[in-house]
Regions:
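Conserved SAM/SAH-binding beta-strand->alpha-helix loop
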Residues: 108
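Class I SAM-dependent methyltransferase "Motif I" SAM/SAH-binding loop
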Residues: 83-87
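SAM/dcSAM-binding transferase cores
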Residues: 2-11, 18-74, 214-310
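S-adenosyl-L-methionine
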Residues: 119-143
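Conserved beta-strand signature within the Rossmann-like core of class I S-adenosyl-L-methionine
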Residues: 184-191
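Conserved SAM-binding loop
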Residues: 115
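A short glycine-rich, Lys/Arg-flanked "PGG" loop and its adjoining helix->strand segment in the class I
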Residues: 169-183
Length: 310
């Protein structure tokens, strides 16, 4: 591994413990000076010599609200990526903004293992990774006005009628995000699902000064999520937007509005299940039998940002 160049964002204290087996370096990275790719696009960051690897996994979140300076061993702004999947967008932000702390979460342990491995090998000590859903995280572990940004890319639309309640972007969730953000804090949303986006455009501006974005994010293409890469390759339109928390909305008013707004009961477009299959590495033809409305198992996807696909 000595041929790998040291990254400028080195951890303050190199990890002394022997890494677990799942952190094995790929043959591709060995041949390409520490650079890995996915669908031909480099994964953000460069794999360092083992002595510079970080420890970023959270086996369990502490009870109650997270003490951010204690968790990251420094005091800095916090960005949360809910449903981070295998970590591409979080890694890109962590590489580009070493002065910012990043927490990536997902309900699937397997994708968090991928994200953790990549962050560890790149020495990104400004990241932490945890297996937890978005609602639970914000409700139980994030203190009011303690986070600078909350990102959610490609939330899972859930196709069955009895799964509507699992959809992440809802008035309740948006109220929790609004409460968690510091004054001037930012929400970032992205999806390839037109009906989901139309719903977001109706409810998100109630809590945020929200604007649509037509162009890719500045971190593209390296910072593109796995879902975004696949959807774009299939010609799907990607819907993006961001906004600041409304300063004229207090907690009680936000709670009242959340209770009065419509739930995300839109009719999900099942044609996008073919993209879901590609995201899982399957052939779309294998999903033809799902025309009866059955969806894949809840959360069974490459990487839910909470209840999401990344």
């Amino acid at each position: 591994l000595n041929q790998f160049e040291s990254h400028s964002e080195q951890p303050s204290e190199p990890s002394a413990a022997k890494p677990p087996a799942f952190q094995k370096i790929s043959d591709e990275a060995l041949k390409n000076n520490g650079i890995e790719t996915e669908f031909g696009i480099p994964i953000p960051g460069r794999i360092l010599v083992e002595e510079l690897w970080a420890k970023t996994a959270l086996k369990k979140l502490p009870d109650g609200f997270i003490n951010w300076p204690e968790l990251f061993e420094r005091d800095a702004s916090v960005v949360i990526d809910i449903g981070c999947g295998n970590g591409r967008s979080t890694l890109a932000s962590a590489v580009d903004r070493p002065e910012v702390n990043h927490l990536g979460t997902d309900i699937l342990p397997v994708v968090i293992r991928y994200a953790t491995r990549r962050a560890n090998q790149r020495g990104l000590s400004n990241t932490r990774w945890a297996v937890i859903g978005g609602r639970e995280l914000l409700l139980k572990h994030v203190a009011p006005h303690s986070v600078a940004e909350i990102h959610c890319y490609h939330p899972q639309p859930y196709y069955r009628q009895d799964q509507v309640g699992l959809r992440l972007i809802s008035p309740e969730f948006l109220q929790l995000v609004h409460s968690a953000l510091i004054p001037g804090g930012r929400i970032v949303l992205q999806t390839d699902h037109p009906s989901y986006w139309n719903y977001m455009l109706k409810v998100v501006p109630v809590f945020f000064e929200f604007e649509e974005r037509s162009a890719p994010w500045p971190s593209a293409p390296k910072g593109m999520t796995r879902r975004e890469i696949i959807a774009a390759s299939q010609g799907l339109r990607i819907f993006r937007g961001e906004g600041m928390a409304r300063m004229d909305l207090n907690f009680e008013e936000a709670l009242r509005l959340a209770e009065s707004l419509p739930l995300p009961t839109f009719n999900a477009d099942r044609r996008l299940q073919a993209i879901d299959a590609l995201e899982r590495g399957e052939e779309p033809s294998r999903r033809k039998g799902n025309a009866n409305g059955r969806s894949r198992r809840p959360g069974h996807r490459r990487g839910g940002r909470g209840k999401s696909r990344k």
